[in-house]
A protein has these predicted regions:
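A contiguous pocket-lining binding segment that forms or flanks enzyme active sites
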Residues: 199
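Ser/Thr-glycine-rich phosphate-binding loops at phosphate-binding pockets of nucleotides
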Residues: 162-168
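Nucleotide/phosphate-binding catalytic cleft detector across ATP-hydrolyzing
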Residues: 1-157, 176-191, 203, 210-309
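Conserved blade-register residue in beta-propeller folds
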Residues: 16, 169-171
Length: 309
């Protein structure tokens, strides 16, 4: 029996139902690096997955980076579930609705590339994975399968998926996506973090890491001065205001319809919203793995319907 594994291929992070790691990839060629953590051996070459951040590439199929990160994600999820390293897998992945129809065939072929089974080593463990199927679903909307009640309670709502590079917007009317309202803003968490880093450098001369900024935005411990923390919080509020303004300018009246916010940036907005924003209603899905879980449930539902025919 094959295993369904949902994978959210973000610009900022790769997520499965139980794992999340940065979408960075460092190639070491034929030379084994110093660490086994995140170490992928494939095709005679060594790669460290989850290190740093790779350059933004609008087309994720232009090189093998996201395929290699997919193998790492499969290995991590299999290990987390306590499953054998030799198994058959059905991948449930996603794309933004704004590019769904255009990119779906290419992304599906990309994830199915190569001979089966796919043999590789991850963190010292040998894997032999047969990818039986790749199914692609709309990001954001699939995540609502984890909160079915949301679709039943409101006639209209705005879905806001705050990813690494983009914030994808789409109105949902009577539980059906209004595809003609799909809109994408280049205001994801990478933009937020980069702006904060630059502002801190400008005001204090200090160079913060992504991890430091992310911890402070999430309200988690980080050893910095109160001055730096104040700058980060101020910029977090500024980012939230900019996002709300851009969403309104895109034609979505946040004072009139409820908004469901998910993705890695949702926690930032949740901490920096103010009553003076006057929003109709905001619902936060704060688990950054919610898309991956939604993809799995969507493929499970599709498979069930097929078996009943």
């Amino acid at each position: 029996m094959s295993i369904i594994i949902g994978i959210d291929h973000g610009y900022y992070a790769i997520k499965t139902a139980h794992c999340s790691f940065p979408a960075g990839l460092t190639s070491y060629g034929e030379h084994e690096p110093y660490t086994r953590q995140g170490l992928l051996e494939f095709g005679g070459c060594f790669f460290v997955c989850g290190s740093g951040r790779q350059p933004i590439q609008r087309d994720k199929t232009v090189n093998d980076n996201y395929y290699l990160l997919t193998l790492a994600a499969i290995a991590k999820e299999i290990k987390q579930r306590g499953l054998p390293p030799e198994c058959s897998v059905r991948i449930a992945a996603g794309l933004p609705l704004t590019s769904f129809g255009r990119d779906k065939p290419k992304f599906k072929d990309y994830l199915l590339q190569g001979k089966q089974p796919v043999n590789f080593r991850f963190e010292g463990v040998e894997y032999s994975i047969t990818i039986e199927e790749v199914a692609i679903f709309p990001q954001g909307y699939a995540a609502l399968m984890t909160e079915v009640g949301l679709l039943q309670d409101e006639p209209s709502m705005l879905l806001m998926d705050l990813g690494g590079w983009t914030v994808d917007l789409m109105r949902i009317d009577n539980a059906i996506p209004a595809a003609d309202t799909a809109h994408s803003l280049e205001l994801g968490m990478i933009r937020c973090v980069d702006d904060i880093r630059e502002q801190v450098r400008r005001e204090t001369g200090l160079s913060l890491t992504d991890a430091q900024i992310e911890n402070m935005l999430a309200g988690q411990p980080c050893t910095v001065s109160d001055t730096v923390r104040d700058i980060v919080n101020r910029q977090g509020r500024k980012y939230t205001e900019h996002l709300l303004s851009a969403t309104m300018e895109a034609g979505f009246d946040l004072h009139a319809i409820p908004a469901v916010l998910l993705g890695g940036g949702a926690s930032v907005v949740s901490r920096h919203l103010s009553p003076k924003d006057g929003l109709c209603k905001t619902i936060f899905l704060l688990d950054d793995k919610v898309n991956a879980v939604g993809f799995e449930r969507a493929l499970t539902a599709v498979s069930r319907r097929k078996s009943e025919v």
